[in-house]
Amino acid sequence: MKIVIAPDSYKESLSASEVAQAIEKGFREIFPDAQYVSVPVADGGEGTVEAMIAATQGAERHAWVTGPLGEKVNASWGISGDGKTAFIEMAAASGLELVPAEKRDPLVTTSRGTGELILQALESGATNIIIGIGGSATNDGGAGMVQALGAKLCDANGNEIGFGGGSLNTLNDIDISGLDPRLKDCVIRVACDVTNPLVGDNGASRIFGPQKGASEAMIVELDNNLSHYAEVIKKALHVDVKDVPGAGAAGGMGAALMAFLGAELKSGIEIVTTALNLEEHIHDCTLVITGEGRIDSQSIHGKVPIGVANVAKKYHKPVIGIAGSLTDDVGVVHQHGIDAVFSVLTSIGTLDEAFRGAYDNICRASRNIAATLAIGMRNAG
């Protein structure tokens, strides 16, 4: 009996690795001789680096890089056990959480630190880089990132433009001859579940600018600046990014990654499950167990449980979802490959109590799920 355990984290409570450990502990009480394969998963957002490190027997690295406001921040990233693949979260270097609420200003925040993390990955010898671009504080179109990698973004006087989305209107020319040559031999995949274009009513500035501190006037300025930026990119690089789905992700970072680095933007969960070789683990298993902090109707939109279930159903494997909580509309997940769902909560309490007791609750629920399966197996002969 081979059981694949592939959960996401329980946000603010347990990492994906800890959730997997708790599930395995509970199941082992009933099925001590089963083969357990633990594959912590993430959806390309928070926790992706940690999950990828755990699944590839990799290592966490740290680097001092330029933060969103130009200050130095100690950002973490990861490298796979074989040293070939680097894992980067934009939020670690250029994230909104790095900027106090009163200082959030997308006219000045820069993505330079993310470019510096990419340089760290190249220095390590990585030839594959997976980047999660959620949680950014920036609206600079990825300009800071490409400047860190050696591109020259110059104004009419030949001087490099400054930090932030507020400087893009001064851009006159782009020179990529100085881009780090190692990028040509590197495959960059971007975990991105946002399909917004770069500009317009559904663009980066209008949709995501407010959460980054943009006023209405700033949104208009930022959108105009990104439109100008796209025109200069089209003229210099012969790439039209203005209306490409995903170009508006992370304040236009999607556009820069595609135009300057030839990166591929794909669903976060799709990139992660492929990188983790999830199919290889699942194709000959008996049962798949997944989960996250809450399973509900939103889980069908790029979340880990459905991503795992999609892989499992290719091989007609049963899937059980274990969550901290379920909602009234959770039944929709049964149409997307999850056969049964269970909540680990046993009593009414505060959210803090649920967080504190999560590990033990998952163990208990997993043990009881396993016992129920064992009863069914015995009755089936």
UniProtKB/Swiss-Prot annotation:
<dbReference type="InterPro" id="IPR018193">
    <property type="entry name" value="Glyc_kinase_flavodox-like_fold"/>
</dbReference>
<dbReference type="InterPro" id="IPR004381">
    <property type="entry name" value="Glycerate_kinase"/>
</dbReference>
<protein>
    <recommendedName>
        <fullName>Glycerate 2-kinase</fullName>
        <ecNumber>2.7.1.165</ecNumber>
    </recommendedName>
</protein>
<dbReference type="Pfam" id="PF02595">
    <property type="entry name" value="Gly_kinase"/>
</dbReference>
<keyword id="KW-0808">Transferase</keyword>
<keyword id="KW-0547">Nucleotide-binding</keyword>
<dbReference type="GO" id="GO:0042838">
    <property type="term" value="P:D-glucarate catabolic process"/>
</dbReference>
<dbReference type="GO" id="GO:0046392">
    <property type="term" value="P:galactarate catabolic process"/>
</dbReference>
<dbReference type="GO" id="GO:0008887">
    <property type="term" value="F:glycerate kinase activity"/>
</dbReference>
<dbReference type="InterPro" id="IPR018197">
    <property type="entry name" value="Glycerate_kinase_RE-like"/>
</dbReference>
<comment type="similarity">
    <text>Belongs to the glycerate kinase type-1 family.</text>
</comment>
<dbReference type="GO" id="GO:0031388">
    <property type="term" value="P:organic acid phosphorylation"/>
</dbReference>
<dbReference type="InterPro" id="IPR036129">
    <property type="entry name" value="Glycerate_kinase_sf"/>
</dbReference>
<comment type="function">
    <text>Catalyzes the transfer of the phosphate group from adenosine triphosphate (ATP) to (R)-glycerate to form (2R)-2-phosphoglycerate, an enzymatic step in (L)-glucarate/galactarate catabolic pathway.</text>
</comment>
<keyword id="KW-0418">Kinase</keyword>
<dbReference type="GO" id="GO:0005524">
    <property type="term" value="F:ATP binding"/>
</dbReference>
<keyword id="KW-0067">ATP-binding</keyword>
<dbReference type="GO" id="GO:0043798">
    <property type="term" value="F:glycerate 2-kinase activity"/>
</dbReference>
